[in-house]
């Protein structure tokens, strides 16, 4: 049980660093859409305290780990990122369908099939070269937003980081919809799908954590720049998080700084 909690914590703390991916593109699109969805700051004192704890842990543990990961050869890091993105497609597909984005769902299915087979379990990305470009990842929180659910309260959780009421519900939905989660948590599925039951629930968090480490390593400079230029880092990250979520719901592009 303790080991499981540690694995979840590692994954979640890395995941919260993905806030740096939010860009400013899509703001005009948001205005044109007439969206009135705004997240309320319900527990600011608590959220700021949890933000400080999470940020301290990131600087002490997770940023150094990301720097160590960056020391690996670029082809290894690129292949690792491709493989985790490929598995992430299995969550995107059902959410594409639930959002009525059937064309995107078909594109994602094609990408997964090509990259899993020709691309050797997703290590390489031949699908892009064949015209099936990555159209973005989807999750159940985005699906709820497409369905019209408001963000609700914004708050920061210990370990899990920033979220909204809608995205917190989305986290549960993600586990229900993600085939990777079910394969690693159900021995009967493992026997039928992969021929053995050597996988465990820990594999799910290893996979998620690996993807998050890869993302953190790509965005070290982005986060450092944001921290150096923000008067109130908590407020800046809150704004970027909420804007990024809106952009993703609208399927508008956001800017992510990366480094091989």
Indicate where each model-derived feature is located.
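Membrane interface segments of multi-pass transport proteins and intramembrane proteases
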Residues: 60-78, 130, 141
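Cationic, glycine-rich low-complexity segments
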Residues: 38, 42-71
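Bacterial N-terminal signal peptides that target proteins for export
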Residues: 1-7
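Alpha-helical scaffold segments that form or flank carboxylate-/histidine-based iron centers
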Residues: 45-46, 75-82, 105-115
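Sec/Tat signal peptide C-region and signal peptidase I cleavage site
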Residues: 18-22
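Bacterial N-terminal signal peptides
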Residues: 8-16
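Mid-length scaffold segments of soluble, non-membrane domains
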Residues: 86-165
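A structured, mid-to-C-terminal "fold-capping" secondary-structure block
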Residues: 23, 30-35, 147-260
């Amino acid at each position: 049980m303790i080991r499981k909690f540690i694995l979840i914590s590692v994954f979640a703390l890395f995941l919260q660093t993905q806030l740096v991916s939010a860009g400013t593109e899509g703001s005009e699109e948001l205005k044109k859409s007439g969206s009135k969805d705004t997240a309320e700051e319900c527990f600011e004192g608590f959220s700021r305290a949890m933000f400080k704890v999470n940020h301290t842990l990131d600087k002490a543990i997770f940023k150094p780990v990301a720097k160590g990961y960056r020391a690996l050869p670029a082809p290894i890091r690129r292949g690792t990122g491709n493989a985790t993105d490929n598995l992430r497609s299995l969550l995107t597909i059902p959410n594409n369908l639930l959002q009525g984005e059937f064309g995107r769902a078909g594109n994602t299915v094609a990408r997964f099939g090509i990259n899993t087979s020709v691309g050797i379990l997703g290590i390489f990305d031949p699908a892009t070269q064949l015209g099936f470009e990555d159209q973005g990842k989807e999750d159940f929180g985005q699906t709820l937003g497409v369905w019209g659910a408001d963000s609700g309260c914004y708050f920061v959780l210990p370990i899990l980081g920033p979220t909204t009421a809608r995205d917190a519900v989305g986290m549960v939905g993600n586990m229900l919809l993600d085939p990777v989660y079910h394969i690693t948590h159900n021995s009967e599925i493992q026997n039928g799908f992969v021929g053995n039951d050597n996988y465990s629930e820990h594999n799910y968090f290893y996979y998620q954590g690996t993807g998050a480490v890869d993302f953190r390593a790509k965005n070290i400079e982005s986060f450092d720049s944001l921290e150096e230029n923000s008067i109130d880092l908590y407020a800046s990250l809150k704004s970027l998080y909420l804007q990024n979520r809106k952009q993703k719901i609208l399927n508008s592009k956001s800017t992510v700084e990366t480094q091989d």
